[in-house]
Amino acid sequence: MPGGKGKSIGGKAGSKDSAGKTQKSHSAKAGLQFPRGSVKRFLKNNTQNKMRVGAKAAVYVTAVLEYLTAEVLELAGNAAKDLKVKRITPRHLQLAIRGDEELDTLIRATIAFGGVLPRINRALLLKVEQKKKGKSDS
């Protein structure tokens, strides 16, 4: 027998033409936009003792990163829209993150060129109001 061990001649037996199939990445199969392969490589390279990283773990971490990014960008886009500009700047990111209580506790980093939140202490406001009342009474 020319093929040996039951193999047929001329390619795989019973398979469709490979031109009819389209290849899908792992990210596309999971419905993600972020690259699962890059995240998995990052996880493998940055773990202690060269631990193994499962495929599902990489998909899960990628999905979490994608969700958090979408959340921050949505809030920053709303902040930019409120200020009537079309470009998101670090200031808009700062306003978005510090305005949301959960994101503020999660992201404690200092954002470069983010500025500070507009806030006036109540004690200072009370002093100004008392001075105005004193001037209006006299």
From Swiss-Prot:
Main location as per UniProt: nucleus
Recorded GO MF terms: chromatin DNA binding; identical protein binding; protein heterodimerization activity; RNA polymerase II cis-regulatory region sequence-specific DNA binding; structural constituent of chromatin
Protein modification: Acetylated once deposited into chromatin.
SMART domains reported in the protein's UniProt record: H2A
Keyword Nucleus: yes
Region Disordered, annotated ranges: 1-36
GO CC annotations on file: euchromatin; nucleosome; nucleus
Keyword list, A-Z: Acetylation, Chromosome, DNA-binding, Nucleosome core, Nucleus
InterPro entries found in the cross-reference section: Histone-fold (IPR009072), Histone_H2A (IPR002119), Histone_H2A/H2B/H3 (IPR007125), Histone_H2A_C (IPR032454)
Stored Pfam families: Histone (PF00125), Histone_H2A_C (PF16211)
Gly residues bias locations: 1-13
Residues bearing the modification N6-acetyllysine: 5, 12
Keyword DNA-binding set for record: yes
GO BP: CENP-A eviction from euchromatin; nuclear-transcribed mRNA catabolic process, non-stop decay; regulation of transcription by RNA polymerase II; silent mating-type cassette heterochromatin formation; transcription elongation by RNA polymerase II
Highest taxon listed in the record's lineage: Eukaryota
Compartments where located: Nucleus; Chromosome
Stated family: Belongs to the histone H2A family.
Function as written in the Swiss-Prot or TrEMBL entry: Variant histone H2A which can replace H2A in some nucleosomes. Nucleosomes wrap and compact DNA into chromatin, limiting DNA accessibility to the cellular machineries which require DNA as a template. Histones thereby play a central role in transcription regulation, DNA repair, DNA replication and chromosomal stability. DNA accessibility is regulated via a complex set of post-translational modifications of histones, also called histone code, and nucleosome remodeling.
Quaternary structure (record): The nucleosome is a histone octamer containing two molecules each of H2A, H2B, H3 and H4 assembled in one H3-H4 heterotetramer and two H2A-H2B heterodimers. The octamer wraps approximately 147 bp of DNA. H2A or its variant H2A.Z forms a heterodimer with H2B. H2A.Z associates with the vps72/swc2 subunit of the SWR1 chromatin remodeling complex. Also interacts with rbp1/DNA-directed RNA polymerase II largest subunit.
Name the UniProt record assigns to this protein: Histone H2A.Z
Protein's organism: Aspergillus terreus (strain NIH 2624 / FGSC A1156)
Lineage of producing organism: Eukaryota, Fungi, Dikarya, Ascomycota, Pezizomycotina
Gene that specifies this protein: HTZ1
